[in-house]
Amino acid sequence: MRTVRGPSDRVVVVGAGLAGLSAALHLAGRGRDVTVVERESWPGGRAGRLDVGGYRLDTGPTVLTMPDIIDDTFAAVGETCSGRLDLLTVDPAYRAQFADGSSLDVHSDADQMATAIKEFADAKQAAGYRKLRDWLTRLYQTEFDGFIAKNFDSPLSLVNPQLARLAAIGGFRKWDAMVNRHISDPRLQRVFTFQSLYAGVAPRQALAVYAVIAY
């Protein structure tokens, strides 16, 4: 994102999707006069809903992976997320169904997930899951601090100490290869790699940096 030079007291944000609304709140919190324009008659962008034949259908994102960012957005204008929204944890997050007829409930809690994997496969796979989770945590922390939470005015901005750390922990290796180091059960490997499809990339082709989606 290039830094804007010169006066920026009045800002127009195009689109009232989640990104547009977030940008507007952060700008307003910094004293800017903000106008948001949206082509639809409702805000939310892709995070919408259709009512069809008595059913409610999501039109876009169905998973909230980084609630802390919502907290930061509300805090920018002196509000709190909890004062406006009730975020309820879904447990299990989802159920994975496999071609052999087996199924696995996927939990966000590490202990619950390890127990589920032990019952689904064996203790070795459960231990591998914990090691995988530790690696994903380090990967996320490295990416968030060095890249996700930063603005970049030029490609040279990408060159920083975090880039070397990212390479050292395997961020530029293949996603499926890194997962396979910890887990050998093909079904479990799919559980922790299919998320690359969200980015339109097959797990065998995706770089491990994308694995933060699974985290």
Residue ranges and their predicted role:
Residues 1-3:
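A short, compositionally biased domain-edge/stem linker segment
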Residues 5-142:
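N-terminal glycine-rich phosphate/pyrophosphate-binding loop and immediately adjacent elements
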Residues 99-207:
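Rossmann-like flavin
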Residues 205-215:
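Residues forming anionic-ligand binding surfaces in small-molecule and nucleic-acid pockets
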